């Protein structure tokens, strides 16, 4: 692509400038390109000269002029290069190259924008991993949208991606034990027993529903059991019930996992014990106050962390370290975890444990996403009594649908809090961003259907025979420019962990297309121009379909 040619040419220009004495021999700078907000500033721009000026001193514009003297670019790709402002170098693609993009899209179809940056290396992406103590919450739905989109982005950049959901089902889980105790209390209450739920139990009415379902299927037989036996039965029942619910929620949201990994397997296979032994052998543990501790401060954490409690039960960190050891031992080249906002404090200690086991920390990344707040217009939606202190994802999907939910979850960077407007998400109007993008795809489908009704063969059978030089209107060239950005958008969104770039890009494509549609009649009396514009319209549809598929949103042909 032209951007790659420019980056290569700028890199060589720096090297040539150093050889010619125009730059000091030791200076280095990574070449980065940006898309200017104002199209008058070219198609891409670089601040390379400003970066170099900060290292060597002197005016950035002079350094930019020196770089241009050593810059060699193919004329068929770049039409104009100029220095602007404080020292930016702006590049304008040639119309000839832009038109060639349409041929490339027609040739590659749904593979357009894909690259082999990952080289077939393996990546394990773990996300959602909600505790099995209640329904999947809206905030975890955001994790699902982020994780699934990142998985597709990495797959499109040449990675062999596996998706995994981690289930905290170990018998020593305090949270599941507390849930079993809450379920027991709700079960006994149905028989008139004066039993209070635990002080730190689960308040949602969904626990009452589960108790009633249990009575419908099993009756009162648990009343006769000893409490220990009853709690064990409720532990197992609730775990299966809730995990099955999580699986249904993910299926309804269009998110499919390659593996549902259960924490209990780590204990069954003695992997937690093996990880603890490896930490001991490596000298990263010590005993104090009857507990086993990880020397986390030696590995970048603010304080040492408990691995095994005083009562001999392994803490959550021991299992987390064993789980990530398991991931590495499965042979993955790279690991990415996506965690919720309440797990920020766990990042350093988990990475410390992984590093203590001797694994390369650069192969392991933990991403934190922020909270979601639901609004109806200007009014924030409060938590429901039925769900306790959470808003279930299933309720959101019933309200606005999976398409709107996924699109809206991806409209902000994961580091930002997300305000989700429920009324806007359901609105059948162009100020609803998901409707706006889907409508662009549907409008294109309508154009293509009308063309077929007129006897035009579609898809255009031989794009090489189409005279694309007829595409000269500013709106035509603007649309091609926007379509040409897809490969870089996909690569940047993956490399920078920014799936929200895809919803922004989708809206930009839709906006430029709508402008083109308003000002350029596609089906006219000029057969040659019609063929060229149909080729452009088909390319726009391909790009929109790719982007919508990547973010998990449907691409309707009629609306």
Roles of regions detected by a PLM:
Residues 1-99, 106, 110, 114-559:
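Non-catalytic interaction-recognition regions
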């Amino acid at each position: 692509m032209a951007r790659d040619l420019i980056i290569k040419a700028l890199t060589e220009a720096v090297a040539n400038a150093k050889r010619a004495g125009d730059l000091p021999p030791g200076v280095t700078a990574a070449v980065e390109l940006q898309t200017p907000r104002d199209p008058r500033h070219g198609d891409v721009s670089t601040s390379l000269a400003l970066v170099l000026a900060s290292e060597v001193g002197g005016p950035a514009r002079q350094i930019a002029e020196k770089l241009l003297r050593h810059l060699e670019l193919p004329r068929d790709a770049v039409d104009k290069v100029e220095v602007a402002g404080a020292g930016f170098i702006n590049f304008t693609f040639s119309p000839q190259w832009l038109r060639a993009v349409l041929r490339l899209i027609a040739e590659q179809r749904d593979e357009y924008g894909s690259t082999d940056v990952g080289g077939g290396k393996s990546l394990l992406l773990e996300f959602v991993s909600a505790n099995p103590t209640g329904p999947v919450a809206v905030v975890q739905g955001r994790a699902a949208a982020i994780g699934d989109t990142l998985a597709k982005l990495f797959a499109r950049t040449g990675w062999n991606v596996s998706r995994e959901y981690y289930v905290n089902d170990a018998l020593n889980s305090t949270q599941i034990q507390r849930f079993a105790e809450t379920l027991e209390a709700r079960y006994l209450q149905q028989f008139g027993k004066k039993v209070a739920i635990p002080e730190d139990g689960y308040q949602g009415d969904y626990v009452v529903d589960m108790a009633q379902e249990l009575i419908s299927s099993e009756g009162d037989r648990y009343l006769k059991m000893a409490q220990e036996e009853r709690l064990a039965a409720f532990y197992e029942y609730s775990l299966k019930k809730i995990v099955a619910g999580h699986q249904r929620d993910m299926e309804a949201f269009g998110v499919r996992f390659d593996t549902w990994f259960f924490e209990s397997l780590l204990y069954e296979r003695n992997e937690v014990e093996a990880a603890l032994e490896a930490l001991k052998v490596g000298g990263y543990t010590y005993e104090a106050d009857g507990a086993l501790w990880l020397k986390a401060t030696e590995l970048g954490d603010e304080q040492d962390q408990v691995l095994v409690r005083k009562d001999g039960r392994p803490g959550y960190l021991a299992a987390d370290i064993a789980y990530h050891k398991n991931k590495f031992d499965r042979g993955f080249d790279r690991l990415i975890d996506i965690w919720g906002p309440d797990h920020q404090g766990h990042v350093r200690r988990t990475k410390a444990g992984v590093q203590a086991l001797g694994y390369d920390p650069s192969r392991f990344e933990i991403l934190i996403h922020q909270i979601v707040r639901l609004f109806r217009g200007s009014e924030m939606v409060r938590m429901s009594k039925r769900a306790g202190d959470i808003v279930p994802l299933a309720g959101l999907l019933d309200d606005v649908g999976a398409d709107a939910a996924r699109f809206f979850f991806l409209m902000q960077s994961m580091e930002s809090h997300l305000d989700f407007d429920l009324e806007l998400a359901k609105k059948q109007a162009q100020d609803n961003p998901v409707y706006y993008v889907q409508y662009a795809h549907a409008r294109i489908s309508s154009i293509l259907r009308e063309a077929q009704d007129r006897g035009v063969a579609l898809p255009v059978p031989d794009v090489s025979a189409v005279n694309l030089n007829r595409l000269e209107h500013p709106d035509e060239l603007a649309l091609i420019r926007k379509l040409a950005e897809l490969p870089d958008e996909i690569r940047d969104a993956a490399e920078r962990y920014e799936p929200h770039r895809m919803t922004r890009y989708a809206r930009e494509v839709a906006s430029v297309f709508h402008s083109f549609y308003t000002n350029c009649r596609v089906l006219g009396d000029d057969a040659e121009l019609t063929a060229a514009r149909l080729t452009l319209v088909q390319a726009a549809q391909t790009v929109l379909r790719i982007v919508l598929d990547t973010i998990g949103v449907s691409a309707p042909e009629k609306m």
